[in-house]
């Protein structure tokens, strides 16, 4: 028996070494097989991946050995378990190894995954774009990370363009993760507009575009300026107190009212309890979706059936999402009785009743939720980052104000003169670049097999177009971590359009709300700087341009500012 134990231990050790050896051949290029322990970041990544891979699979094999050698022999002691299970064990390990390497060779190279966790523990959740850039140095612009499933990361602009434009139709799918299917109920085609796929997505996107064409131009400008004046009146009251204030709620109130007017025909006072409840639910959904509990539910869908309260963050995510759905459902029922002229929900009900399109109530509810959440959260977060950079760079704030006053004087800013304010545009672009409010982007999925970067990508493969990595790519933006609006100006001081600067995405899935967001950002930013100065007194805490865990978006750490009303334009 001692001999058999030694044989079994030798088999275990050999299988582990074989596993690691095979992983080095598959995953590592010739230049990265030798793991060198030095202080460079790329070498640390190679070391930590190698150690994680080796450790995780030793643990798995150890668990197998523990079960085979200690548990089952106690159940049936007379049977020669050692002989039987040594054969089963060897066959099983060989099967695992072969099936694993057959599976991973379907994808581009990447770091070896840990058991259960994949590569998730080694991706910085706050700054994933930095991790993507580090892995790009090792594996190239297209590589595989094992998250809830094998996911292709595209970390270079040309590769992203190839995937989303050249192969735009093939990569236009969305994730079918449990955290999404929970609300859409349709694993094959999704629902709403952000998570919809195939014909369902095309039909809804067409209707949104057709509806929004009525708003673009003067109507949109007037709507944004109306709610900007409401915001200015609120800030003027705050300025009188000369106290520190967190601008998140006033900004959220103004921007939310713009998109609410468009989608459901409603406005709210900033402190309205119903409105505040919806904001809390949106924040919960956006934040909890990136937690470990939701990750595990996506990996192991059966976990969603555990009693509520065991996975608290998953429960909070689910409850908040369904409360939002119910809120929109109540509004939809009201719209069926009392139609609101000119809003998107009424437009969709008209289509339902005319039988031109068969849109379900759930599709309308989810689409309004997509428009509301997407149209508010990212814009609010961008402006919050903007105030931080102005507080830390008062000379930039002063230069923007000078340009705004030169162009508009005491007139209301308008989009027609935007090109006459190149420095303001450059500052906004630099804020968007550094804020990178969607660092994880929204994952795509292949609905057809396609070739990207020379790799054949199987159908139903998730893809993350890491546009955030492009925004911090030193080959594109010199000193990418510095706040430098001048990078968006040419030698003549005119605004410089940079092809790689794509904060709203590209291809068929480009953000539908891009024009709304650009209008909001420019008009609100220009109006506030025309009439207000954001400042701090000596001794006030200086806000740090660092992210806090906010979920799918990247908000800054909470901060406060003082506001001075300049009186350059009447706001009543």
From Swiss-Prot:
Expressed in the 2 embryonic head hypodermal cells XXXL/R. It is found in: Membrane. This is 3-ketosteroid oxygenase. PROSITE patterns: CYTOCHROME_P450. It catalyses: 5alpha-cholest-7-en-3-one + 3 reduced [NADPH--hemoprotein reductase] + 3 O2 = (25S)-Delta7-dafachronate + 3 oxidized [NADPH--hemoprotein reductase] + 4 H2O + 4 H(+); cholest-4-en-3-one + 3 reduced [NADPH--hemoprotein reductase] + 3 O2 = (25S)-3-oxocholest-4-en-26-oate + 3 oxidized [NADPH--hemoprotein reductase] + 4 H2O + 4 H(+). Disruption phenotype: The daf-9 mutant is dauer-like in head shape, cuticle, and deirid ultrastructure, intermediate in amphid and inner labial neuron morphology, and nondauer or abnormal in the intestine. Also, the daf-9 mutant exhibits abnormal reproductive development, molting defects and increased adult longevity. One of its GO terms (cellular component) is membrane. It is a multi-pass membrane protein. Dafachronic acids bind directly to the nuclear hormone receptor (NHR) DAF-12, suppressing dauer formation and inducing reproductive growth. In a non-cell autonomous manner, negatively regulates body wall muscle arm extensions to motor neurons probably by preventing daf-12 isoform b activation. It comes from the Eukaryota. The keyword Heme applies. Its EC number is 1.14.14.-. Belongs to the cytochrome P450 family. The gene is daf-9.
């Amino acid at each position: 028996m001692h001999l058999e134990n030694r044989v079994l231990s030798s088999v275990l050790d050999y299988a582990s070494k074989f596993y690691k050896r095979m992983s080095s051949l598959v995953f590592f290029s010739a230049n990265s097989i030798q793991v060198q322990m030095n202080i460079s970041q790329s070498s640390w990544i190679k070391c930590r991946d190698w150690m994680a891979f080796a450790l995780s699979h030793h643990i798995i094999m150890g668990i197998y050995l523990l079960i085979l050698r200690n548990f089952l022999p106690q159940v049936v002691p007379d049977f020669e378990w050692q002989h039987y299970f040594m054969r089963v064990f060897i066959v099983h390990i060989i099967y695992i190894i072969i099936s694993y390497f057959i599976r991973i060779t379907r994808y581009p190279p990447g770091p070896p995954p840990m058991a259960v966790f994949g590569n998730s523990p080694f991706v910085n959740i706050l700054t994933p774009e930095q991790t993507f850039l580090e892995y790009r140095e090792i594996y190239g612009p297209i590589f595989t990370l094992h998250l809830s499933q094998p996911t292709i990361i595209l970390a270079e602009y040309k590769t992203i363009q190839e995937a989303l434009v050249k192969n735009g139709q093939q990569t236009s799918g969305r994730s079918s993760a449990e955290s999404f299917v929970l609300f859409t109920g349709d694993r094959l085609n999704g629902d709403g507009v952000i998570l919809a796929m195939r014909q369902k997505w095309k039909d809804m996107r067409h209707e949104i575009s057709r509806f929004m064409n009525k708003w673009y131009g003067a109507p949109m400008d007037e709507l944004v300026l109306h709610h900007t004046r409401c915001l200015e009146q609120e800030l003027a009251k705050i300025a009188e107190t000369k106290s520190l204030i967190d601008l998140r709620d006033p900004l959220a109130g103004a921007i939310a009212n713009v998109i609410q007017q468009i989608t459901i025909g409603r406005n709210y006072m900033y402190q309205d309890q119903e409105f505040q409840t919806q904001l809390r639910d949106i924040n919960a959904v956006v934040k909890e979706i990136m937690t470990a509990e939701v990750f595990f539910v996506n990996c192991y869908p059966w976990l969603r059936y555990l009693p509520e309260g065991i996975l608290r963050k998953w429960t909070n995510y689910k409850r908040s999402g369904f409360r939002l759905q119910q809120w929109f459902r109540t509004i939809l029922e009201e719209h069926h009785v009392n139609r609101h002229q000119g809003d998107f929900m009424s437009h969709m009900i008209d289509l339902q009743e005319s039988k031109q399109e068969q849109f379900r109530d759930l599709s309308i509810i989810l689409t309004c939720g997509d428009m509301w959440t997407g149209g508010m959260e990212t814009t609010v977060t961008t402006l919050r980052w903007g105030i931080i950079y102005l507080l830390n760079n008062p000379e930039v704030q002063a230069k923007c104000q000078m340009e705004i006053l030169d162009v508009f004087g005491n007139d209301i800013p308008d989009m027609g003169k935007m090109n006459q304010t190149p420095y303001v545009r450059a500052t906004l672009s630099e804020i968007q670049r550094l804020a990178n409010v969607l660092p994880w982007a929204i994952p795509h999925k292949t609905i057809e097999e396609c070739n990207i970067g020379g790799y054949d990508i199987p159908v139903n493969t998730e893809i993350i177009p890491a546009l955030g990595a492009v925004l911090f790519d030193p080959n594109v933006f010199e000193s990418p971590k510095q706040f430098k609006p001048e990078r968006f100006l040419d030698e003549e001081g005119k605004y410089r359009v940079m092809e790689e600067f794509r904060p709203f995405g590209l291809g068929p899935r480009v953000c539908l709300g891009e024009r709304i967001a650009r209008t909001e950002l420019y008009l609100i930013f220009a109006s506030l700087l025309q009439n207000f100065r954001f400042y701090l007194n000596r001794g006030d805490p200086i806000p740090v341009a660092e992210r806090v865990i906010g979920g799918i978006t990247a908000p800054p750490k909470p901060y406060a500012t003082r506001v001075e009303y300049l009186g350059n334009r009447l706001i009543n």
